[in-house]
Amino acid sequence: LPVESNSIDVAAQNCLFNIFTAEDLHQALKEMYRVLKPHGRLVLSDPICDMDMPEALKNDERLRALCLSGAIPLNDYIDMITSVGFGTVEIRAKRPYRILSPKHYPGAQENIIIESVEVCAIKDPMPQDGPCVFTGKSAIYFGEYELFDDRQGHTLLQNQPLAICDKTAHNLKALQNENIYISESSFFYDGGGCC
């Protein structure tokens, strides 16, 4: 892009990255990372799917024009975003979008569920233990004390939900503390959490 490095606060795209090949998507994400200021945000909205797209559908130009053939699994999508350096990824929303059924798409061996995902990738420094990915998980402490401190920077107040990243959810769950509830991913996140 003919844009200076570290010069943009927010960049956004809607369904554009889904029409790229994996190599082109990686290059586009690298460029977005380059032009964003530190703590700048890349807001994305793309179709994703829960499985690898069959080659016959991946190479279908009609589906590419519909922004469907480039859909990849959410974890792969997040990995592509974090592989260029984004230290924080927030899944803001995820909802059903389309179904590619074998009846209508002969290249599909089974129904392929396509979902629309809204993501905010933040140009934060990459934590030593990997990126902070927020998928809408929360932790609630309901023990006998006023709070629970995991000594890793997370303080859970008595009976107050706290938005946490998936990495923190995993670490809290590993404590096997029967007084801490960890929710499943809601795939809705509007900020205010900790990693």
Sequence positions of predicted segments:
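Class I S-adenosylmethionine-dependent transferase superfamily signal
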Residues: 15, 31-33, 81
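A short glycine-rich, Lys/Arg-flanked "PGG" loop and its adjoining helix->strand segment in the class I
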Residues: 26-41
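Short alpha-helix
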Residues: 69-91
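Short "lid" loop at the C-terminus of a central beta-strand within the Rossmann-like core
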Residues: 16-17, 47-51, 93-98
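C-terminal lobe and adjacent flexible extensions of AdoMet/dcAdoMet transferase-like proteins
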Residues: 84-96, 100-195
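A short SAM/SAH-binding and catalytic strip from SAM-dependent methyltransferases
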Residues: 9-24
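A short acidic, Gly/Pro-enriched loop at the edge of an enzyme's catalytic core
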Residues: 1-11
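Short, glycine-/aromatic-enriched active-site segment of Class I SAM-dependent methyltransferases
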Residues: 47-68
